[in-house]
Amino acid sequence: MSLMTMNILLAFFISLMGMMMYRSHIMSSLLCLESMMLSLFMLATVLTLDMSFITMTIIPMTLLVFAACEAAIGLSLLVMVSNTYGLDYVQNLNLLQC
């Protein structure tokens, strides 16, 4: 395993730990999710280039599409919760179930 791959995996696990530690606020959770998706994108790109799989080049682009969708949905939930309750706590998401 190369040094670059280990650094990317370390970044993923650090952001996973951040997700576990700062899970009370939506904004902190979204930032940790975005860093996890970024490290997964970098890992998929590095592994695709290292293994010289031409057919696997669609996987990093698919990850970017999912990351953009996740960011849009997360930010819309953040705006809705903060406009409704004035706070960005994750526990307020349970109150949105009509």
From Swiss-Prot:
<comment type="subunit">
    <text>Core subunit of respiratory chain NADH dehydrogenase (Complex I) which is composed of 45 different subunits.</text>
</comment>
<keyword id="KW-0830">Ubiquinone</keyword>
<keyword id="KW-0472">Membrane</keyword>
<dbReference type="GO" id="GO:0008137">
    <property type="term" value="F:NADH dehydrogenase (ubiquinone) activity"/>
</dbReference>
<dbReference type="GO" id="GO:0042773">
    <property type="term" value="P:ATP synthesis coupled electron transport"/>
</dbReference>
<keyword id="KW-0520">NAD</keyword>
<keyword id="KW-0679">Respiratory chain</keyword>
<keyword id="KW-0999">Mitochondrion inner membrane</keyword>
<feature type="transmembrane region" description="Helical">
    <location>
        <begin position="36"/>
        <end position="56"/>
    </location>
</feature>
<keyword id="KW-0812">Transmembrane</keyword>
<dbReference type="Pfam" id="PF00420">
    <property type="entry name" value="Oxidored_q2"/>
</dbReference>
<keyword id="KW-0249">Electron transport</keyword>
<comment type="function">
    <text>Core subunit of the mitochondrial membrane respiratory chain NADH dehydrogenase (Complex I) which catalyzes electron transfer from NADH through the respiratory chain, using ubiquinone as an electron acceptor. Part of the enzyme membrane arm which is embedded in the lipid bilayer and involved in proton translocation.</text>
</comment>
<keyword id="KW-1278">Translocase</keyword>
<protein>
    <recommendedName>
        <fullName>NADH-ubiquinone oxidoreductase chain 4L</fullName>
        <ecNumber>7.1.1.2</ecNumber>
    </recommendedName>
</protein>
<dbReference type="GO" id="GO:0045271">
    <property type="term" value="C:respiratory chain complex I"/>
</dbReference>
<dbReference type="InterPro" id="IPR039428">
    <property type="entry name" value="NUOK/Mnh_C1-like"/>
</dbReference>
<dbReference type="GO" id="GO:0005743">
    <property type="term" value="C:mitochondrial inner membrane"/>
</dbReference>
<feature type="transmembrane region" description="Helical">
    <location>
        <begin position="58"/>
        <end position="78"/>
    </location>
</feature>
<comment type="similarity">
    <text>Belongs to the complex I subunit 4L family.</text>
</comment>
<keyword id="KW-0496">Mitochondrion</keyword>
<keyword id="KW-0813">Transport</keyword>
<keyword id="KW-1133">Transmembrane helix</keyword>
<feature type="transmembrane region" description="Helical">
    <location>
        <begin position="1"/>
        <end position="21"/>
    </location>
</feature>
<dbReference type="InterPro" id="IPR001133">
    <property type="entry name" value="NADH_UbQ_OxRdtase_chain4L/K"/>
</dbReference>
